Amino acid sequence: MRTQWPSPAKLNLFLYITGQRADGYHTLQTLFQFLDYGDTISIELRDDGDIRLLTPVEGVEHEDNLIVRAARLLMKTAADSGRLSTGSGANISIDKRLPMGGGLGGGSSNAATVLVALNHLWQCGLSMDELAEMGLTLGADVPVFVRGHAAFAEGVGEIFTPVDPPEKWYLVAHPGVSIPTPVIFKDPELPRNTPKRSIETLLKCEFSNDCEVIARKRFREVDVVLSWLLEYAPSRLTGTGACVFAEFDTESEARQVLEQAPEWLNGFVARGVNLSPLHRAML
């Protein structure tokens, strides 16, 4: 029997770089919110202990794919603690809608969905805290997708506080380029000393993204798309890019702007949600 599981996108509603540690990692403050839009992961259980990804990603080796790594990590962790039945395996496929290198968290979301789904299907019984701890070894953003609630994150992105920002509508646009995160974080002109503020203060301020100035300067495509969106609504970069988003109070407003978009603009309309569609599907 095949089951389907949502793997939603996320937006960074704001992102501030507050410093850089001696080990090179940047400290930050950011606000994560999910979208009711994303990839769909299909899982069919096997009884031979094998993990097979039926929809490989071009340019990514099977064992390097975050989906496979997440499945194998859960398999080992559960087996080592005696919580995995002998022969547990899975065929996994993905209907991919989220772009790679877009700042929407696609790979991290995929890994989190696999952890949560296989924990349920294999009846491992691991807690969300245990799954989130495992997820952190796969990527800094994986835990927020595992926990499934909009969150304020700080530290190097590993300290989470659940929050409930307004659930607005967004027009999300992809400029057609992929921006590797290190390109932004290694840029010498990246702001690295934004003052730390409390959650309460940040939620009252106008939101912005410290990475945006670098993305716009280094990638003309980002600047062009963002300039167009800013003519219609408050707009900014998500994560380290490349995707940008415009914020609206209603779905109809967002769709009206999308209908006016030039042919070269690749975008979609989605609602921001504080409870992940993955966790909503499990209720």
From Swiss-Prot:
The keyword Transferase applies. SUPFAM superfamilies: GHMP Kinase, C-terminal domain (SSF55060), Ribosomal protein S5 domain 2-like (SSF54211). Homodimer. GO terms for molecular function: 4-(cytidine 5'-diphospho)-2-C-methyl-D-erythritol kinase activity; ATP binding. Transmembrane segments: none annotated. ATP binds at residues 99-109. Pathway: Isoprenoid biosynthesis; isopentenyl diphosphate biosynthesis via DXP pathway; isopentenyl diphosphate from 1-deoxy-D-xylulose 5-phosphate: step 3/6. Belongs to the GHMP kinase family. IspE subfamily. The lineage of its organism: Bacteria, Pseudomonadati, Pseudomonadota, Gammaproteobacteria, Enterobacterales. This is 4-diphosphocytidyl-2-C-methyl-D-erythritol kinase. It catalyses: 4-CDP-2-C-methyl-D-erythritol + ATP = 4-CDP-2-C-methyl-D-erythritol 2-phosphate + ADP + H(+). Catalyzes the phosphorylation of the position 2 hydroxy group of 4-diphosphocytidyl-2C-methyl-D-erythritol. It is an enzyme of class 2 (transferase). The active site is at 10, 141. Its EC number is 2.7.1.148. One of its GO terms (biological process) is terpenoid biosynthetic process. The gene is ispE.
